[in-house]
Amino acid sequence: MSTGPSHISVCIACRNEADRLGACLESVAWADERIVMDLGSTDDSVAVAERNGARVVRRDAVPIVELIRNEIAAHATHDWILVLDPDERVTPGLAAELRRAAGREDVDAVVMPRMNWDLGYPPSNPNERYEQQLRMYRKSRVQWPVIPNALPQVPDSRTYRVPSTDDTVLVHDRNRNIPEVLDRIVRYAPLQAQSMIDRGQVFSARAMFVSLGTRAKRQFIDGKAWRDGVPGMLRAAILVGFHFYIWAAFWQLSGARRTPEDDRFVQRVGRWLERGQHGYRAVTAPARIVGGLGDRARRMFRRA
């Protein structure tokens, strides 16, 4: 039971995150309560949590945290729940916004900008730099959906949106290295694919190509990934690749059936690319440009 409209409980699910959990907890030292649900850590995660003043609750591991968001919230003393992962940190500016929002009777949820860091760098494009995340809510009025990567849906009239600035972000230090990328894919791709099946979606090659093409356009072209150099291009490739694995899992979990309709569509795409005047030249343009620059550089060095 909440002891007041402005009291906030921070809820964190954790498994073997001792190297990052401390910074996460320190960033919310201002909160009225901090709960860490440990999922069978074999490192010093529990000691780190207790050393930082958090209350530790233990349970068996689960593949994804969405399965236990509501369970963690049930352990909280207060109505306002701030959901964090161990690889996230609340900036001082965001903390001030959250405390103000918690004191408003007309608000049931708070959407905040999250800045995702991949391979040590955040995106510079404003459209990609600030990912809108509903991460604070009243548990008496909102339930967390048990779906991979899903967020609660709350009417805009009952939602407060934190301004998107670097001073008011939730810092997300994800995908620090390739093993972390692969771990995320292995855990989430099959479950997201299964959720697509559970919602009644039917696999088709056309839908897969449209989805992946749309995501590639968003990341590489609309998101101007090239402006962030190698980290930007790798980030875009990781995000598109993640969805490729979701579709691969979707096809496999749907029965891995090869159908004439899918074959015809894929073959049409292949012939279109093979003609070389449109898609093939567009797809191979980066390689041809790099190759041309390399040839030019070699000629310059030979002349020198």
Which residue ranges define each predicted feature?
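N-proximal low-complexity "stem/linker" segments adjacent to membrane-targeting elements
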Residues: 1-27
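Acidic helix N-cap motif at the loop->helix transition within catalytic regions
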Residues: 19-22, 43-52, 93-94
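Short, structured coil segments at secondary-structure junctions
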Residues: 30, 51-53, 132
